[in-house]
Curated annotation (Swiss-Prot):
Assigned GO CC terms: cytoplasm
The organism's taxonomic lineage, starting at the top: Bacteria, Pseudomonadati, Spirochaetota, Spirochaetia, Spirochaetales
Organism: Treponema denticola (strain ATCC 35405 / DSM 14222 / CIP 103919 / JCM 8153 / KCTC 15104)
Name the UniProt record assigns to this protein: GTPase HflX
Region (Disordered): 162-181
PROSITE patterns from the UniProt entry: G_HFLX
Subunit structure: Monomer. Associates with the 50S ribosomal subunit.
InterPro entries: G_HFLX_dom, GTP-bd, GTP-bd_M, GTPase_HflX, GTPase_HflX_N, GTPase_HflX_N_sf, P-loop_NTPase, Small_GTP-bd
Places the protein is found: Cytoplasm
Amino acid sequence: MYITDNETKKALLIFTDIFSGPASNSHISRSTLQEKSAKALKEIEEKELKSLVETIFLKPLSSLRFRIAKENPATLVGSGQLEKIAQAIEEEGADLVVFNSAVSPRIQRNLEAALNTCVIDRSEVIIQIFADRAQTREAVLQAELARLEYSMPRLTRRWTSLAQQRGGAKGTRGASRGAGEKKLELDRRRLKTEITKLKKEVERVRLQRSEQRKTRLNGDKKIGAIVGYTNAGKSSLLKKLSGAEVFTEDKLFATLDAETRKVFLQTGEKNIQILLTDTVGFVSNLPHQLIDAFRSTLEEAALADFLIIVCDAAHPAMPECLEVTKKVLDELSCSDKPSIIAINKMDDIFDEAQLLNLKERYPEAVEISVTTGQGLEGLKKKITDIIIFDK
């Protein structure tokens, strides 16, 4: 894994688009609309990677975007594109290169050899953020497991780099390589042992969480899960509805643990008590290592009676963020649960056309602002309706 030190490192950002050829003339108007949409999504994609990179205290430099017919199996991009990356590294003084697309261990080694610069991908950045953000024992275990599983196939990268630094004197290269291979094998065994141990510990925590769930499920209180894209305001909403202290911060992946709090709702003269659980935020192309490691936390959504899907109204790609959330929920087999879409941060929207578009596109959604309290009573009413209807 790439660990930053006290000195701020500068990162060159690389994006690749698979190009399948020009659109036919019979679809010119349609392709024009698609191109406009694609351009907007590319801008959002670049902003998101920049934000992720800044979260691990790297300084993002310029972004290079390449269109490729297909991925080069050796270096992902073509030789001419590789030269442009090398030129940008030299001109901008980049310390490392960050690819937005997934980079295999083999391609990563080849790129580092060709560019003589550290190369990481978006998955590694996200895993590093999770490792930095982990606070509780459960989150630390899960983040460490994801980190080790990601690092395992990349071990040879360390030793290739070390061998290049040593150079190897004439007549000693064979012995040096043999020692390196021996050390590499020892490291692999050690890592496998650590991964096995961590998996057992994570499973133990998972069982404990399962027992806690059983206790909650056996009670008479309905359970809701707050889900959504990272930094949409999920923890702030839980804090506002429950009145309890919940850790909140305006950062990506500020919450990695499933926090559960009591919430009291009023229906007529009767008080209803429910349990609401905050969950880890989603992001597009979340590394599978993290999905596997944090499955016990994500399962809180799968076992809930209903879902509150929180969206950030001010996010330029809110519809795409909502689709990412729905995709993850589908993977967890809970997309058919009763759900409420809560569009948060409405106090940040001042454009009348944007407001109208949100109302037309999501007529069933509740427009809220955790900051001002706007729409929270309406949200509580929706929750109450779900609970009464579900009885």
